[in-house]
């Protein structure tokens, strides 16, 4: 009976018509035998049920055929069924305008790819995908393993292990996973590019307090938990007051004086110092949480995000301003080309960078950095010994310099002596570009390196959104969030290349960075000083904070030094005597 039923079904022709595009699509169907069956006769629930079995790629393609299928394929009911199929254990669809569609696409596009620099295989491999993960938000490779944080705060521990493939034992990266902890907000480790130094993992999480007899109410508190990266064992925990909520954590400094920088929801920076060499000892001690100087001396600033290295920290405000902390003279000279404003006794004093537009995100290497503004322009600064700035030469830059031939990057990464940029080459493809030192295979296809950004021989996934490189491997994170739109704006015609920048006076009425409020704060700080000597020193600090060009800062510092020396010598500096 089954063999006869198949030909009978094939004789009936289904009429694929669109209600909004007309009832007739052609004359060919009229010539067919039998009465055609229109898709309009199917109930909407049946149509949604049928197309919910399609792969996500085919469902998106079907929704682009006509208006009717676009409305059907865009329904939340279809995406709810797909999301249940992709992530059966997902209980909550999350938040947003389109929660089920967002959740389904997050879980469909999630993936972590890696390519080893050494060896014969020069292709991307995919790590194990945790079934419990709700998309991938960020990741961090350590010495032995990889840690991934999803969109519901679950931190996964992807282990390297020996596996048997075709009867042969092979060492594979990120092939097994376990859940490290839940309720995580952010995590960090040693900021150096070499993963050998990443012994501990610091996790910023929210925990419900333990029930105490005699209390009726309990509030969730933020805490920092420290884990061994090798085994995932928790060795230390510090809990904060429930009134303080944080959203980001970064590390800076050496192991014996490791500084933890914590960013609050209000945009303030707090710091505390721990000794990593004593974390594995079974004892408890108290650490002091203090307000960082960037938030103490500049209270009007609201920090949006921060990034760090072993001896420097970069802050980006909500208005797009950038402030720098440099803690060693060598790195300061590489970044700014001078030691004029470096104070070894006050290393936390922030310095403002002079930038033409609002900065969206940045990347910080050991002695160079990259900035991306709201128009998609890339600015590089710092040491350029290996051509890691991508300017086409090997001359150091003491102030942000635009890389004119590269715009609108997806993400930017700066390493020890090379830089990587993930760019959208076309609508359906992405490419990875790099510059700097190519030793050890860190620039695939360019073993001798390059002083300009060149296309690397890496097959980039379609939904790649983040990248990271270690000494042994290149990692690419794949994820797509439909609620994250393109952040870039079109550059005004008056500010295209070849047109002079508008003067400070022309932009003063807009005051995008709150400069007027900042100047009032500076004046109040100078007024609070008691002596002329203290006021001169405070003015030097303020010059370092203000977004001035390097030559302008040197001029003001030299002029203030002249006035200070004249004051110390007992003689005043006045106008020259008139000629007779």
Swiss-Prot record:
Listed Gene3D superfamilies: 1.20.1280.50, Regulator of chromosome condensation 1/beta-lactamase-inhibitor protein II
Placement of RCC repeats on the sequence: 376-425
GO cellular component term of the entry, any: SCF ubiquitin ligase complex
Pfam family, one: RCC1
GO terms, molecular function: ubiquitin-protein transferase activity
Keyword Nucleotide-binding part of the UniProt annotation: no
InterPro entries (UniProt xref): F-box-like_dom_sf (IPR036047), F-box_dom (IPR001810), F-box_protein_24 (IPR052866), RCC1/BLIP-II (IPR009091), Reg_chr_condens (IPR000408)
Alphabetical UniProt keywords: Ubl conjugation pathway
GO BP of this protein: axoneme assembly; chromatin organization; mitochondrion organization; mRNA splicing, via spliceosome; piRNA processing; protein catabolic process; protein ubiquitination; single fertilization
F-box domain segment(s): 36-82
Complexes and interactors: Directly interacts with SKP1 and CUL1.
Function: Substrate-recognition component of the SCF (SKP1-CUL1-F-box protein)-type E3 ubiquitin ligase complex.
The protein, known as: F-box only protein 24
Organism: Homo sapiens
Lineage: Eukaryota, Metazoa, Chordata, Craniata, Vertebrata
